[in-house]
Amino acid sequence: NTIFISAQQHTEHTLEFLWMDSFRSDLVNQTELWQKTICEKTGLAFNEFHMRDLLNIDHPCTFDTVEEYDLLIFRKLISPDDQIHENESSPESHDTLFGLATTPMSFILTPNVLVSVREQGNKPIENYIQRLDTIMGRQIEEQNKPRKLPNTPVDLCLRLLNSMIDGYLDLRTPLTRRVEYWQQQLLQGNRRFKQWHQLFHENMAFQQIENLCEEQIETLEKEIK
């Protein structure tokens, strides 16, 4: 079988799965219309509790499953490469942890549907979509050479998550430098260490970042299982 992607439905080919990508602004500003559109395209209707989760910009990472679908909420680190701008007229603001801002990206999965909800300007996701657009410009027979196209909603979801996890990996270098700095300060024997308040503050930051990463790992492990 030839696997390919298309923005339009091809009646002469079997639809393996459908991906619907949405901006949070569409969901927040036109909630009922968004739900209606999703239902018309996918047949999915989300329960009210999950709708609240999707609308909550501060919702922690989580994984939940119901009979009709699975829900995964991942918190992406906002990097300088992103173009995620907060609306000054909106009361919403992204969660900030010691200077590290995060934003939720939600995934609703079934065996043949993936619905994603993200902020406009999420650079890793936009880069991935650009790659798919480039692939769509090829002939159908050439799109999956070599075999790089996702063939299930879970496969696509994991690829999108992988593109965002790099933001957490990029924290390793600056955090390592800070740890080395404080080690040097503490081990200097020629003068008395007096920066306990700053050290305590940075230790709190390290603990919060560790907790955030552990939450993400636990959530992803549930999703993979």
Segments (PLM) and residue ranges:
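Long, non-coiled-coil amphipathic alpha-helical linker/lever segments
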Residues: 139-164
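Helix-boundary and N-terminal cytosolic regulatory elements
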Residues: 1-147, 219-225
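Membrane-associated alpha-helical segments
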Residues: 112, 181-225
